[in-house]
Amino acid sequence: MKIVVTNDDGPHSPLLEPLVRGLEAVGNEVVVVVPERPRSAAGLARTYHKPLRVRRLGGYYVVNGFPADAVFLALKLIAPDAELVISGVNVGENIGIEATYGSGTVGAALQAGVLGVPSIAASMEVGGDVDFMIKVVEGAVASARAGLDGVLAVSINIPSVWKGGVYCVRKLARAVYRERLYEGVDPRGEKYYWRWGPRRSEFEPDTDAYYFYYMRGVTVLGLSESGVASVENFGRKLGQLIGAVKVDC
């Protein structure tokens, strides 16, 4: 299978090379097209106010735009015959409605879906096992071969410690973090602000955050034009391929 790999962490992401090696080891042709620098939290941002440029960096193509721009150039110029787009693996999970729709990783996958190419966004909690990550992504690729009809993209989140479950998400957590506004004063006497906050300790059952943080499961989310979409067959197949002891799909 010919696969475009992109991300929102740029060409120096520690998870990019292992992912590419893993996909190539099982016979896939991989074309890497990524933003030239980290573009986390870019969502579906696109570039319209300046020219886009592509250059080679080793074996990768790098783009001076957002993750969605990288996918657009990949599918329109560099690899128009790609059969699948994998966005990630993101360094850090994308859980909850804000992270899902604000994520450049997920945004890139949605861009591929809008262009008619099946796509998978993959994110892993910091400290996760790279070998397990590759196993999950390879399982997702095999599951996608059966088709992803009715969805623009599938978003998969991999916990740092897996307790054996795969959960198909039907509801996103509304607020994963207790964000607040922090105010400071710079050396010139001008005010500045940071938005930040700790993760919540409790989540509503049956949300992606509950399955991820409490059940420590791999979560599978289908995204369509109308929001959350069913990916039950995909989730069941993925669970089978990675040896899950519980599949809730």
From Swiss-Prot:
Function of the protein: Nucleotidase that shows phosphatase activity on nucleoside 5'-monophosphates.
UniProt remark on cofactor binding: Binds 1 divalent metal cation per subunit.
GO molecular function, one term: metal ion binding
Cofactor(s) demanded: a divalent metal cation
Cysteine pairs bridged by disulfides in the record: none
Keyword Cytoplasm: yes
Compartment list: Cytoplasm
Organism: Pyrobaculum aerophilum (strain ATCC 51768 / DSM 7523 / JCM 9630 / CIP 104966 / NBRC 100827 / IM2)
DNA-binding recorded as keyword: no
UniProt enzyme class: hydrolase
A GO cellular-component term linked to this record: cytoplasm
Keyword tags: Cytoplasm, Hydrolase, Metal-binding, Nucleotide-binding
Protein family: Belongs to the SurE nucleotidase family.
Name of the protein in its database record: 5'-nucleotidase SurE 2
PANTHER family given in the database record: 5'-NUCLEOTIDASE SURE, PHOSPHATASE, PUTATIVE (AFU_ORTHOLOGUE AFUA_4G01070)-RELATED
Catalytic activity line of the entry: a ribonucleoside 5'-phosphate + H2O = a ribonucleoside + phosphate
